[in-house]
Amino acid sequence: MGNNGLTPQELVAYGITDTVEVVHNPDYDMLFKEETQPGLAGYERGIVTESGAVAVDTGIFTGRSPKDKYLVRDETTRDTLWWSDQGKGKNDNQPLTQETWQSLKSLVTRQLSGKRLFVVDTWCGANPDSRLSVRFITEVAWQAHFVKNMFIRPDDASLASFKPDFVVMNGAKCTNPDWQSQGLHSENFVAFNLTEKIQLIGGTWYGGEMKKGLFAIMNYLLPLKGIASMHCSANVGADGDVAVFFGLSGTGKTTLSTDPQRQLIGDDEHGWDDDGVFNFEGGCYAKTIKLSPQAEPEIYQAIRRDALLENVVVRHDGSVDYDDGSKTENTRVSYPIYHIDNIVKPVSKAGHAKKVIFLTADAFGVLPPVSRLTADQTQYHFLSGFTAKLAGTERGVTEPTPTFSACFGAAFLTLHPTQYAEVLVKRMQAAGAEAWLVNTGWNGSGKRISLKETRAIINAILSGEIAHAQTSTLPIFNLEMPDSLPGVDGKLLDPRNSYPSEAAWEEKARALAQRFITNFDKFTDTPAGEALVQAGPKL
């Protein structure tokens, strides 16, 4: 289905004039034809790979640009939003004046005027009560394809009466010449106005700005209604038992929730309301670096016609070298969720979660592969949002870089982190849910915990088998760890066993504990935060 009646005249309301043609809600075949046209140049051009998926490049931006993110500070947002210039914690919510907003808006509308435009109408949020109707406007076919993959695709009847709650205008080709005099970070911008309900994009072609932009908006609207808004994946077992997996990029959200034994609800963004857990999205956005059909068969098989690859290296014969990270380590693929066989249908939602899993990839080798959290520890580790990356291996630099990202998604939070923690804990308590901290990273041997062992741990949590295990307490962090689990080498479960001596582990543990303590200081500006210090590591 192509144009279903949006006229160039109707775009004038957004400030876009002289539109040559509106390609409204194109179907996948039309998008495929448009994005692979021989006449396209530069980053607009898509290449057909051997699987049938189209590959595109996003240019110098191969990830989000958090320093170029702004929100208009006005009556709507002044007292509710978590601003970068308030309180102890640092964040990316930089305030923008109404005047600068107008200037950015006219840059984008000028860029989009006089063009042939793609307009895609979508839903963000699987629950009709709280979903947003979002309209995307772009001049680039593959960007229209990206949002069609990633958001929920309304049926024809809903499209016929579609009225957007929020509009995203993507002007990737335009940049802001006045950024210095306006006191902005660069010529590129991702700007939001919660009063006008518009997102503007300029200078960056990265698809994820549209996906995560809407996540930031949902993260503002839902908790204010008492609905948890979560950076997590989610799945459900045959008995209707729901699990959610929180974690930062690269910790295993997509991989671990895509499980042949369980139905996928979604891989990245969810809400939790009075009915249960629901997906915000209609697609998945998986990392593809070092992807193999052996380790991740479901994701590998999802890469076919209608999937969209980003920044991968395509060989002359159309095959993809997933091991090649020369453009970026953040190579990605977006695909509609139904490319995974085992999903919740027809709507990506299920009941209340009974298991909440925090994924961390601890490159320091200190934390156990799995531990059970008390209610206070749950809030503490949720607010800490710890993971650690191994630095580049050049010149022998292997010192890990710790990342503390509140709620396992600080980059996307628009309210104070404690608001998300409070809503989550309320939902967990009402559902009688348990929380587990799972380390998918390293131990003292310098080897990463294998995916096979992590899956065995997750299976033990989901089956309830882990509840019967004898436990020990890890000192300093005071974490309760099982002594044995089926399918897991017992020695692995206590990180101290992977060190030459307990003292060697303790030295590393003290250093990491200090980082936790220093990081958590920013939450002690509220009585609730101050009270949680007790649940953290103690030196």
Swiss-Prot record:
Q: Please provide the record's keywords in A-Z order.
A: ATP-binding, Cytoplasm, Decarboxylase, Gluconeogenesis, Lyase, Manganese, Metal-binding, Nucleotide-binding
Q: Which cofactor does it need?
A: Mn(2+)
| Classification via Gene3D superfamilies | 3.90.228.20, Phosphoenolpyruvate Carboxykinase, domain 1 (3.40.449.10), Phosphoenolpyruvate Carboxykinase, domain 2 (2.170.8.10)
Which Pfam families does this UniProt record tie to the protein? Answer: PEPCK_ATP (PF01293)
The record's EC number reads: 4.1.1.49
The record lists ATP as bound by 212, 231, 247-255, 296, 332, 448-449, 454
Is Iron-sulfur included in the keywords of this UniProt record? no
What catalytic activity is recorded? Answer: oxaloacetate + ATP = phosphoenolpyruvate + ADP + CO2
Q: What does this protein's record comment on cofactor binding?
A: Binds 1 Mn(2+) ion per subunit.
Q: Pathway, per UniProt?
A: Carbohydrate biosynthesis; gluconeogenesis
Task: Report the locations given in the UniProt record.
Answer: Cytoplasm
Q: Name one GO cellular component term.
A: cytosol
This chain's function reads:
Involved in the gluconeogenesis. Catalyzes the conversion of oxaloacetate (OAA) to phosphoenolpyruvate (PEP) through direct phosphoryl transfer between the nucleoside triphosphate and OAA.
Q: How does it assemble?
A: Monomer.
Name the UniProt record assigns to this protein:
Phosphoenolpyruvate carboxykinase (ATP)
UniProt organism field: Erwinia tasmaniensis (strain DSM 17950 / CFBP 7177 / CIP 109463 / NCPPB 4357 / Et1/99)
